[in-house]
Amino acid sequence: MSDIGDWFRSIPAITRYWFAATVAVPLIGKLGIISPAYFFLWPEAFLYRFQIWRPFTATFYFPVGPGTGFLYLVNLYFLYQYSTRLEAGAFDGRPADYLFMLLFNWICIVITGLAMDMQLLMIPLIMSVLYVWAQLNRDLIVSFWFGTRFKACYLPWVILGFNYIIGGSVINELIGNLVGHLYFFLMFRYPMDLGGRNFLSTPQFLYRWLPSRRGGVSGFGVPPASMRRAADQNGGGGRHNWGQGFRLGDQ
């Protein structure tokens, strides 16, 4: 048990709380402590009955059962792996900036969910984070099932197809990829590559709540992966080795 505790405490703080909630809320629903009916994002209940908790619970809940358990575990792994890589990598020392990215993506996903009657938001938020990681490390070579290898920028779309095979739907993954692209475009591509204004800026109250541990620069300024490729490759990260021939989570 001490090994599990040490592993859990080693997870970056924001990812750790997100991971814990994504385990706890489905477990609460599975055990019947709270009816899962209260966890879904139902527009009528949220907008007209003022059940304001639903966007939060819909972000962490997933109906785990014989037909969905594998899909849940795969996406829980994606959450741990890529949220950890972002928080401890590109966002290292800047928890406020990382939390702002999650909040921006989450708000976009909630609005989309209300408009499209999407009742569960766990997969879209995870995929949006994975998409941002893939774009910041777009030229790294990742490995997938059966020894397939490709650039990281294609990983979100490969996973979209993979989740379609095991889950039968691509809407959640597609929404997550599009929201992740919106954040990446507004935060990086438009101001840095196209010379446009910066539309996204982390609010100062988040810096007061979660101060940067180094640098003290307001706003997130890590360049895209094309400028960081050598440093990242020297660090040895970025391999997605959990397919055939690799142990889950190997680097």
Curated annotation (Swiss-Prot):
A single GO cellular-component term on record: Derlin-1 retrotranslocation complex
Subcellular location: Endoplasmic reticulum membrane
Tissue: Widely expressed, with lowest levels in brain and heart.
Modified-residue entries (Phosphothreonine), positions: T202
Spans traversing the lipid bilayer: 16-31, 70-89, 95-115, 123-137, 155-166, 171-189
Region (Disordered): 229-251
Any one GO MF annotation of this record: identical protein binding
Superkingdom assignment: Eukaryota
Pfam families: DER1
Motif (SHP-box): 241-248
Positions where Phosphoserine occurs in the chain: S201, S226
GO BP of this protein: cellular response to misfolded protein; cellular response to unfolded protein; endoplasmic reticulum unfolded protein response; ERAD pathway; positive regulation of protein ubiquitination; proteasome-mediated ubiquitin-dependent protein catabolic process; protein destabilization; response to unfolded protein
Cytoplasmic compartment residues: 2-15, 90-94, 138-154, 190-251
Upregulating conditions: Up-regulated in response to endoplasmic reticulum stress via the ERN1-XBP1 pathway of the unfolded protein response (UPR).
Keyword line: Acetylation, Endoplasmic reticulum, Membrane, Phosphoprotein, Protein transport, Transmembrane, Transmembrane helix, Transport, Unfolded protein response
Topology with respect to the bilayer: Multi-pass membrane protein
Modified residues (N-acetylserine): S2
Subunit structure: Homotetramer. The four subunits of the tetramer are arranged in a twofold symmetry. Forms homo- and heterooligomers with DERL2 and DERL3; binding to DERL3 is poorer than that between DERL2 and DERL3. Interacts (via SHP-box motif) with VCP. Interacts with AMFR, SELENOS, SEL1L, SELENOK and SYVN1, as well as with SEL1L-SYVN1 and VCP-SELENOS protein complexes; this interaction is weaker than that observed between DERL2 and these complexes. Interacts with NGLY1 and YOD1. Does not bind to EDEM1. Interacts with DNAJB9. Interacts with RNF103. Interacts with HM13.
Family under the similarity heading: Belongs to the derlin family.
Function: Functional component of endoplasmic reticulum-associated degradation (ERAD) for misfolded lumenal proteins. Forms homotetramers which encircle a large channel traversing the endoplasmic reticulum (ER) membrane. This allows the retrotranslocation of misfolded proteins from the ER into the cytosol where they are ubiquitinated and degraded by the proteasome. The channel has a lateral gate within the membrane which provides direct access to membrane proteins with no need to reenter the ER lumen first. May mediate the interaction between VCP and the misfolded protein.
Protein's UniProt name: Derlin-1
Organism: Mus musculus
Lineage: Eukaryota, Metazoa, Chordata, Craniata, Vertebrata
